[in-house]
Amino acid sequence: DCSSDVCSSDLSDITIRNATLADAPRILEIYAYYVEHTVITFEYDVPSLAEFEGRMRDIMKKYPYLVIERDGRIEGYAYAHAFVGRAAYDWAAELTIYLDHDVRRGGLGRVLYEALADRLKAMGVLNLYACIGYPLVEDEYLTRNSAQFHEHLGFTLAGTFHNCGYKFGRWYDMIWMEKIIGEHRPDQPDIVPYQY
């Protein structure tokens, strides 16, 4: 169970914990690889550390921002943020996950994403969304691995935006995937902001 502040899973040497701003340099190092070498993010330029810390601060006002560590080294991170900045969307959250490019496909992503979903469910979030770059033909910048990862976790395709992202001289689709994790009621209680 990964619903507490610290989580140990069947991967005995890993820990999941809340991120802090002190983690920002390592988290940014992980993210920078994807900006510079992939279309997993549509961002062109690696943000400055100050800008990245500001993004983290904004997310942490309401949502969980988690890191996964192995032997004390951050190997990945995941967070949720507002799906759309309007009150009627409060029960929906967009999720983001990045693992160090050298440690993918070891089960860390699944454990980290499930820990994030557990925390969101405890907040009262009902709908999880993922915005994913998607290639018509896989290439050196983008595969379909992210879509397949989400599908294995129970996400389903909600929609496709065709040729909406341009990076490295090529056009890419963007897909939205969703997963419902709670009951939609006519008297829905408000979500509770995440507590650090």
Question: Which residue stretches match the model-derived regions?
Answer:
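Short, small-residue-biased leader/transition segments that mark boundaries at the very start
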Residues: 1-8
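A short beta-loop-alpha structural element at the N-terminal edge
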Residues: 15-27
